């Protein structure tokens, strides 16, 4: 495991972009599985500026969890957000976007194997320690592949999510974990220092041989380099 502690959110975002561009600039096909949400917002702003006007047709994008499309959207919730946050701003060719969906999740792992695995999975840390849609108490540490989960949501009733499981995620060549803010400090300490526990699903990720954590000082306040 490699821990990179940055001064603030801006620097965390800049460092994450450097990791992504380091992979994207390879003279070969590059497979990036990326996260939606609030944490990567600045990452995508910076990255979109850097890729505009340059040829990154070798880079292909994927998501690691998804739910049903809302309204008349072409994509599910995750991919719709990624489109808004990054794909549209970076003018990514739709042919380079390969969504995990509620329809293809059962064949997703075979598909990922066929493309040569993901070069990077970039993900954030849930406040309850979840990764992808693997929440505490979902038996997520039992070598599970991509699967369908149902959750009772306070405002939306029961929702279903397709999500990559532990085995699927651990097959990636590199896991890039982005964490910011003091509100994530306690759970990040639990992930990195505590035992591997299903009540803190992300704790299993530290077993990956190429696991990089980029955290700002606020999130890393209980850690030492």
Give the role of each language-model region.
Residues 173-225:
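ATP/nucleoside-binding phosphotransfer catalytic cores, i.e., glycine-rich phosphate-binding loops
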Residues 121-167:
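Class I SAM-dependent methyltransferase SAM-binding "motif I" and its flanking Rossmann-like core
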Residues 33-37, 63, 122-125, 177-180, ...:
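Short beta-strand segments
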């Amino acid at each position: 495991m490699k821990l990179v502690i940055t001064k603030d959110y801006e620097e965390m975002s800049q460092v994450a972009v450097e990791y992504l561009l380091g992979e994207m600039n390879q003279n070969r096909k590059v497979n990036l599985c990326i996260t939606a949400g609030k944490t990567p917002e600045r990452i995508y702003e910076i990255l979109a500026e850097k890729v505009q006007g340059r040829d990154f047709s070798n880079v292909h994008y994927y998501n690691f969890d998804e739910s049903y499309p809302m309204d008349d959207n072409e994509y599910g919730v995750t991919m719709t957000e990624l489109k808004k946050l990054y794909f549209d701003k970076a003018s990514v060719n739709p042919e380079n976007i390969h969504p995990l969906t509620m329809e293809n999740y059962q064949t997703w792992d075979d598909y990922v194997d066929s493309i040569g695995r993901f070069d990077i999975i970039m993900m954030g840390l849930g406040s309850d320690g979840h990764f992808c849609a693997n929440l505490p108490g979902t038996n997520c540490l039992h070598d599970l592949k991509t699967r369908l989960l149902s959750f009772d949501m306070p405002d939306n009733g029961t929702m279903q999510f397709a999500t990559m499981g532990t085995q699927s995620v651990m097959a990636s060549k590199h896991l890039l974990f982005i964490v910011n803010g003091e509100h994530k400090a306690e759970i990040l300490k639990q992930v990195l220092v505590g035992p591997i526990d299903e009540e803190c699903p992300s704790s299993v990720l530290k077993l990956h041989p190429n696991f990089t954590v980029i955290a700002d000082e606020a999130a890393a306040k209980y850690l030492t380099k």
